[in-house]
Amino acid sequence: MLGTMPATMPATNHSPETLHCLLTRHIIETGHAPGLQKLADLAGLTEEKTAEVLRKLEEIHGVILVPNSLRIWSLHPFALNPTSLWVSTATGGWWANCAWCSLGIWAAIKRDVNIFTSGGGEESSMDFSIESGQTRRKDLLMHFPYPPHTWWDNPFAPCANILFFSSEAQLDSWCLRHAHPRGSVLPIDVAVRLAELWFGDYASPDWVRKTPARAAEIFNELGLDKSFWKMSGSFR
């Protein structure tokens, strides 16, 4: 379970990381992101200062804002608009940006979840649970069409195409029909562990944006294909 935090944070703490924690916990508890005034109240800051820190969080890719505004579009792993992935517990539910993010929600909230989606985002429905880091659907695959060093060139298209599949044949057919490359394919157990290592601290006050070096450590720990998962300074 999530640890407790004060109703407001000390006004001397103006870090983007603190704002990230407040945003994440608000989304977990309510299912939506706070507006600027509410976020300022939670942070114990003025709206002007909150806007400044929020922009800094955007600069380090800790949040995605609606263009030309301070409205929050997405806070990984949470999508704040409808998607093809719904993650639920007995007490709440959230949209996920992609298959990886759906597992990331489990890792961030540290509770068993049920994930409802479809194979390749198409008509074959999937409904499975993650309980204590395990799923009975051992046949599932998670596909990353594009390597991580390209993810922030366009955070919407790569993320939307990270999907679950129930077989190699289904994946190959999907890639052919939609003209997406066959990238890195992870068995579900590896995908769950990747989500745990990546998103496990996202609701923590100790969260920091991962550096290329830390990302590479995680990928190497899981034995991921270095030709696909190699990191560079372009991972922003």
Specify the residue positions occupied by each region the protein language model found.
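Mid-protein regulatory/catalytic core that forms ligand/cofactor-binding pockets
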Residues: G92-A215
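Short, Lys/Arg-enriched C-terminal cap helix and immediately downstream tail that follows
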Residues: G62-V63
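Short acidic, hydrophobic short linear motifs in intrinsically disordered regions
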Residues: E29-L42
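Short alpha-helical segments that sit at the start of domains
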Residues: M1-C21
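Short amphipathic alpha-helical elements of helix-turn-helix/winged-helix folds
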Residues: L22-H26
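Short amphipathic alpha-helical interaction segments
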Residues: G44-E59
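Extended, charged low-complexity segments
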Residues: A203-R236
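Short, cationic-aromatic polyanion-contact patches
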Residues: A11-P16, G35, V66-T89
